[in-house]
Amino acid sequence: NSAWMKTAGAVIYFVAPVAYQSFSTGSWDGLILFGCLPWMLLFLARASRSSPFGPIGGPTSRFAFEADIFREVLTLGFILGLVFSFSPLVLFAVTLTVVCLCVGSLVAGWKLGFSRLFLILILSYAMAAALNFPWILDYFFSDFSWNTIFHTRSTVAETVDLLGALRLQTELGQNSVFGWGFPALAFVPLMLARGERWAWAVRGCSLYLAGVAAIWVNGMGYLPFVLPRAEVLLVPAALGVAVASAMGVGSLQRDLQTYKFGWRQLIPVTAIIASCLVILPVLGSAFSGDWGIPDDELNDVLFSEEETNQNIRVLWIGDDDLLAASGRQFLDNYTISITSTLESTFIDRWQPPEQPADQFVAEAFDLALKNGTTNLGKLLAPFGITDVVLIEKSAPLPSKGLSVELPEKLKLSLSRQLDLAKIEIAPGINRYRNLSAFGFASSVEGVALIDKQFRTYASGTQPLSVSSLVATGATGTSYQGMIKQNSEVYLAFPFSDHWKAKLNGQTIQPSIALGWGTGYFSEESGLLEVTYETGKKHIYLMSLQCLLWFVAFVGLARSLATARRVQL
């Protein structure tokens, strides 16, 4: 109930450099977890009924809510579902937090409502999964792998060592004495705290050490996958330091006076020095007002208002930490991703399930790397790819940012392609325009693509006679144009019978083209209109999901409105 404890915990949490490093590197996962994890810890503490949120292990605070499993499951499940839709890493963070609470309680020898905690956690996970079921079914169950959660990261871009993790500093070589205030604030309370403050201080230290240990394990390569970025892994550590610091303030208020005069009376001086060490760097950074965010962005140099062509699909190659969009693994340590614009947005974080086209694109690049073709643009054209962008810096010079060089053989192979025109945007940022691109919807003379495999097309030497159809909407779901007799219409979209085509008002049936795309064959000339119609199953699932969110929100609002605090 101490205002000093609440203030101290909040201040120490907000001065932790992990949030500002997430700002400077554009880590959405880091920012999302930094904002939501304290609330998750609060809900988990209530679920465990541990003092002061319940009677287990000590007295109950007069500000605590009465126990209600239904309300607690609704609250935690709703927040989990909401955050999970933006960052699946929240499940990893919450699970780690629960493990640290349990381990900390066992080390401290303090009671914790384990059974109630796990019951509420499992039910909350189930509720979060139900709220996101259509997306989970499509994205996770279709082809689940560790990359589904942790993306295609590599250790190439890691910029933190063990000592840096102890100081919550995520940049290699950032040897600042100020960061040593964080471990001091984490462990000093263990020398003073008593009772439930001792238990929560140990739990906070468990969170802190778990975050640091995750950095160390990831750096040593002991796991079969690469963990998230350092600023993400250190969010639980920052929260643990904040919890322990709050308990330290409480122990200075309540527990210090219970000890005889001795060395413990020097601990307040140590705590004050440690607090100054961690607060001063933030005050210094506040003068600039940008918190380390680069002055220039990739969007500033890649995208211009003059480029209004909607028939554009960009293939990005770089380290996963440098790319805004999620993607697939490429050349072991790098990532390849595809977006519909040169301007990176938050929406690019949602990557569709893997398609056969992904494998074909990888094969095309593999062929180019082995000097098997000098017309890579032709091989990428059936996938609608109009541009290839190589990213080696997270921000253009002179701004500072992450920098990961791409293999020289990749850059040399692209320079040998006759149908890729290089546009040097900035040092470390190169764009190649595909001169062989023929758009998302095209009319092709003769029988060239339908019922043929991509490898057959790639080995062909005859040029195609292609003319693009005109997009009739801003969403890229409808096209039209005049086509000749005995010609094909090719759509650079995965095959689906939801594409409806009419030639002179008569419906024609789709066929598979190049082993993945959608094609139509016309035996007569005339006006062709192609439109994508969303399937009823998809509409029903989305309607069900919206209904579930509405019911969950109404139930949560009603349960919170009727919640009562403990009467002491």
List where the protein language model places each region.
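Membrane-embedded transmembrane-helix bundle of lipid-linked glycan/lipid transferases
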Residues: 1-291, 295, 300-303, 309, ...
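Short secondary-structure boundary/capping segments
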Residues: 27, 98-101, 142-148, 328-336, ...
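Active-site lining segments that contact anionic ligands and/or coordinate catalytic metals
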Residues: 77-79, 175, 201-204, 231-233, ...
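Extracytoplasmic/lumenal acceptor-recognition loop(s) of multi-pass membrane glycoenzymes
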Residues: 80, 277-281, 305-387, 391-397, ...
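Short, hydrophobic/aromatic-enriched beta-strand segments in well-ordered soluble domains
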Residues: 385-386, 430-437, 527-535
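Short acidic, glycine/proline-enriched helix-loop-strand junctions
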Residues: 395-432
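Short glycine-aromatic motifs
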Residues: 416-421, 435, 444-447, 467
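Active-site-proximal, structured, solvent-exposed surfaces of multi-pass membrane proteins
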Residues: 451-568
